[in-house]
Amino acid sequence: MKTWKKIMAAAGAAGLALGLAACGGGDSAADANKLIVGASPTPHAQILRYVADNLAKKQGIELEIKEYTDYNQPNQALNSGDLDANYYQTVPYFDEKTAKNNWQFDHGKGIHLEPVGIYSEKLKDIKDLKDGAKIGVITEETNQKRGLQLLADNGLIKLPKDENQQLVAVIAKSKEYNPRGFDLSEVEGPQLVRSLADLDIAVINGNFALDGGKKPSDALVLESPKDNPSLNILVWKKDSKKLEAIKKLDALLHSPEVKAFIEKKWPNKAVLPGF
């Protein structure tokens, strides 16, 4: 009798262990399809919410979206494991930061473009800009180069051949690069729109312009989308254990539905599909 009880107890324990293993396996499968994605509020988080509400469940993906308002935290959070992916940066920014920090990241193809523009609350035409005018540019280096390029493309400044230096400081002090004596100021991206009251013009990234209530038609000048390298991308760790779910998300972000959503959401072309 005792032997029989021992056998039954052992069988029960084995059954319990199998049950717990099965439950654990189910949780693991669910976790593998839950993605925490960091994003800028506009337009990245808006695009991700559309995917979460309309497309993700059909692919068995659950999205949790964390919003960030600066350019440093999303990559740091991805590297530390707090995020499974992020969606906020351009290809040139990705290339520069991953090389500088030795991050083992990967990315998909370009999803969308937010055209950088020159904005003003004092001028109606860029031709009216006077010598010595105050110009605001973003502090973050990669996007700063993009903004300075737009100023150069419009004949306002010249760019040094050696870009591995403090460009704003070099240009501001140089008669060669800044013959009209413009007063260049570096401003944090989210503050650029509100700083327009103290500036003659500012070069503002599309997402910060949108956050500040500006639209492309308000810009004195917009960069051209043709052959533009500054498309925004989904980024993840190369050794992520959730690669299958991440690749599904990246495919959804390149779907006809997302392209149609972008075109409908931003008919003023503040955001352009990149595919």
State each model region's role.
Residues 115-126, 230-243:
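A bilobed periplasmic-binding-protein/Venus flytrap-type ligand-binding module shared by bacterial periplasmic
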Residues 65-76, 165-194:
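Short helix-initiation/N-cap motifs at beta->coil->alpha
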Residues 30-42, 61-67, 134-135:
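Short, well-ordered beta-strand elements
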Residues 108-157, 259:
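A conserved helix-loop-strand patch within extracytoplasmic ligand-binding domains
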Residues 18-22:
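C-terminal motif of bacterial Sec signal peptides marking the signal peptidase cleavage site
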Residues 42-64, 73:
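Short, polar/charged alpha-helical segment
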Residues 24-26:
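Bacterial signal peptide processing site
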